[in-house]
Amino acid sequence: MDAFKQQLEQLSAKNQYRSIPDLVHQGRYIMRENRKMLNMSSNDYLGLASNENLRQSFLQQYGGNFPSFTSSSSRLLTGNFPIYTDLEELVAQRFQRESALLFNSGYHANIGILPALTTTKSLILADKLVHASMIDGIRLSQCEFFRYRHNDYEHLKSLLEKNAGKFDRTFIVTESVFSMDGDVADLKQLVQLKKQFSNTYLYVDEAHAVGVYGQNGLGIAERANVIADIDLLVGTFGKALASMGAYVVCDQILKECLINQMRPLIFSTALPPFNVAWTHFIFERLPQLSKERTHLEQLSAFLRQEVEHRTQIMPSQTCIVPYILGENEATLAKAKDLQEQGYYCLPIRPPTVPKGTSRIRLSLTADMTMDEVKQFVACL
């Protein structure tokens, strides 16, 4: 035990020790240690998670005869229910693709897809800043991989050219909206690059984009009009869609490969049907939420401008707004100060972000008002 204790002490010395907070949620507010704070750290981008009208409308349609609260098994055994197929068909239809497949979480999706679709003779080329879950999936793939410089497509092209013909298949892996900087990948350029090389597939994680961007809330791929050109388009239900789970839209042949070879899918008890029914209910309504998307973008543009004015740094183009302070100590102190003023802001430190870029990750939601954001800015 002494070795584990020493590890924790080392983390504390570097201001990198983490703990799970005790929280009480009250709509867009958080109660912590008897302090009520506006939640500036949530991924509930459309503000749906505490929408009581939506919740009541969903519950009333069942009249007490609710879907099962557990699947009790993997979908490949006895854990499949009609609502799973209903949701997969709805997602595929909305994206105008052949098929969709559900997963228990975005993490399950990202650690399972690449190992299922690659061989030891494959190559993965991933953006330097992809999420930890994608990195874990790459490591589990046991094939060759390189990380290209963040959003540097000339570097990516050089890696594609250098390795052309050497591997049985190549996967380009990126997020659309990056979770810590809030910047956006150029999906059109990535599609163009992919098409220049044979046996090359594009895998895009839209976790922080689905619901928020695109005319129908289908993400950056919809906004860029490239949905049909992305081989594996992953999204999550646990952020803007106020639910749990994830999906991939892809060709039917890839779906069948995942069903047969993806270990996190095969060996996990499936999501509760009740949860999947709620997801279906929310996903049906995505096209109707344009007012929320427009309001969120107005809030985001204002906050990005104000933070950039103070720090001279603003990589973001989205509702994820990094307030980059640099060192751990300054970031921890500022987060504490903002919490004392009534704003639940959390410090993000290495190894989550590169050394010297510690920041407060500000995350806006559509149920906030412009006055609330202006009052927050006055505290910066």
From Swiss-Prot:
Annotated positions binding pyridoxal 5'-phosphate: 106-107, 179, 205-208, 236-239
One term of GO molecular function: pyridoxal phosphate binding
Entry annotated with the keyword Nucleotide-binding: no
Catalysed transformations (reactions): 6-carboxyhexanoyl-[ACP] + L-alanine + H(+) = (8S)-8-amino-7-oxononanoate + holo-[ACP] + CO2
Annotated binding of substrate, by residue: 18, 131, 352
Domain of life: Bacteria
Assembly description: Homodimer.
Official protein name in the record: Putative 8-amino-7-oxononanoate synthase
Source species of the chain: Haemophilus influenzae (strain PittEE)
